[in-house]
From Swiss-Prot:
Pathway the protein takes part in: Antibiotic biosynthesis; phenazine biosynthesis
Superkingdom assignment: Bacteria
Entry keyword annotation includes rRNA processing: no
Protein known as: Phenazine biosynthesis protein PhzA2
GO BP, sorted A to Z: phenazine biosynthetic process
Annotated InterPro entries: NTF2-like_dom_sf (IPR032710), PhzA_PhzB (IPR004964)
Family: Belongs to the PhzA/PhzB family.
Taxonomic lineage of the native organism: Bacteria, Pseudomonadati, Pseudomonadota, Gammaproteobacteria, Pseudomonadales
Length: 162
């Protein structure tokens, strides 16, 4: 059994924490065409993706080229997207941050009627020396369905106390 290593809390690695937090803040502030450069915030083989998909498997984009193509698609399909009500949480690990926020913007996804998406998000950022290694995005998939004009199934909750 591994011995538990006690961390120093949030007072260790202050310069690394500052650098990593600045990257997370920059990522969350990016809007419009600026998002086309978001891949530059990642390590070369870094990845980002949505962990709440209809398949139950994450949709992951790995490497600068894949992340760049994703940004182009996002710019076309969600042109005015913005994060707001952003709250950034540090952890005991100076290389791991969590973000809770809301997102909103037009949804112009091919094959679906034009819509508007508003959702609540949780992001996990794993970083290395100020660059993102992995960004995982979690949100309510029912809100995504509504934004795309897809009927949302009704879940029966008979017997659940209210």
């Amino acid at each position: 059994m591994r011995e538990y290593q006690r961390l120093k809390g949030f007072t260790d690695n202050l310069e690394l924490r500052r650098r990593n937090r600045a990257t997370v803040e920059h990522y969350m502030r990016m809007k419009g065409a600026e998002r086309l450069q978001r891949h530059s915030l990642f390590v070369e083989d870094g990845c980002a993706g949505n962990w709440t998909t209809e398949s139950g498997e994450p949709l992951v984009f790995r490497g600068h080229e894949s992340l760049r193509r994703l940004a182009e698609w996002l710019e076309r399909c969600f042109p005015d997207w913005e994060w707001h009500n952003v709250r950034i949480f540090e952890t005991e690990d100076p290389n791991h941050f969590w973000v809770e926020c809301d997102g909103r913007g037009k949804a112009l996804v091919p094959g679906y009627p034009q819509g508007y998406c508003e959702n609540h998000y949780i992001h996990s950022f794993e970083l290395e020396n100020g660059r993102i290694k992995r960004n995982r995005e979690f949100m309510n998939p029912m809100q995504k369905l509504r934004a795309l004009g897809i009927a949302v199934p009704q879940i029966k909750r008979d017997g659940i106390p209210t």
